[in-house]
């Protein structure tokens, strides 16, 4: 699989172009949530978006670039949701009682929020669990500097006063990678009860690793 760019090959400089890009991404998302991945082609995306295949290729070179753009858009939406639902409430609690921080509850809330997002967005679930995001895009979204772990890192540095070290960056990368694989394993379980059991074990494991085992 090639590492396709996550931004359009042609930046939309006009409102109409921006609307076309959003129609392409919306159409891809609809198809990803509705039909098997192998049937999601650039031709079907263009048809779903109501544009010509030539118009689609003005902005994206192939379907991998579109998949990556859909994934990045979802990650940004999720970051905003996580900030509102978990990070900001926890920050308010810490201002009142720093000693009351509960790492198990915090990480459980992060994971539960992510699971809820996957359940509500089948297109992102198909991409994330199907490992259809290109390596370069995945690398950027998993980075403690620019990706989702950066949000957790910022919270840990600013609110928990955890030292900023290369070891912390590595631990956040490990948590991100392990969490992704375990969530995929959880969704492979034949029953909802089985899925929930795997997720609960994952919460305990990652909490212990990130907050109990000292950075090396």
Where are the predicted features?
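N-terminal intrinsically disordered/low-complexity leader segments
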Residues: 1-19, 214-216
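Helix-turn-helix
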Residues: 23, 27, 31-65, 69
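Secondary-structure edge/capping motif, primarily at the C-terminal ends of alpha-helices
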Residues: 82-93, 125-132, 159, 186-190
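Short, basic, alpha-helical segments at the C-terminal edge of helix-turn-helix-like DNA-binding modules
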Residues: 72-78, 84
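Amphipathic alpha-helical packing segments from all-alpha helical-bundle domains
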Residues: 80, 104-126, 135-161, 169-173, ...
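N-terminal positioning helix adjacent to the helix-turn-helix/winged-helix DNA-binding module
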Residues: 20-27, 106, 148
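Alpha-helical DNA-contacting segments of helix-turn-helix folds
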Residues: 67-74, 144
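Hydrophobic alpha-helical connector segments
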Residues: 69, 83-119
């Amino acid at each position: 699989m090639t590492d396709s760019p996550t931004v359009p090959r042609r930046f939309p400089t006009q409102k109409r172009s921006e609307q076309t890009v959003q129609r392409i991404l919306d159409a891809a998302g609809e198809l990803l949530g509705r039909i098997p991945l192998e049937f999601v082609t650039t031709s079907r995306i263009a048809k779903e978006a109501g544009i010509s295949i030539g118009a689609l290729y003005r902005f994206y070179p192939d379907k991998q670039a579109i998949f990556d753009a859909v994934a990045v858009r979802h990650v940004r939406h999720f970051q905003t949701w996580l900030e509102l639902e978990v990070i900001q409430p926890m920050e308010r609690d810490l201002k009142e009682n720093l000693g009351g921080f509960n790492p198990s509850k915090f990480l459980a809330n992060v994971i539960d929020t992510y699971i809820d997002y996957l359940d509500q967005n089948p297109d992102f679930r198909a991409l994330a669990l199907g490992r259809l995001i290109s390596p370069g895009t995945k690398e950027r979204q998993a980075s403690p500097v620019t990706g989702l772990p950066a949000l957790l890192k910022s919270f840990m540095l600013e609110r928990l006063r955890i030292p900023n070290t290369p070891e912390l960056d590595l631990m956040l990368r490990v948590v991100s990678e392990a969490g992704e694989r375990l969530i995929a394993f959880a969704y492979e379980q034949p029953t909802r009860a089985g899925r929930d059991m795997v997720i609960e074990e994952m919460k305990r494991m990652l909490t212990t690793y990130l907050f109990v085992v000292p950075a090396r």
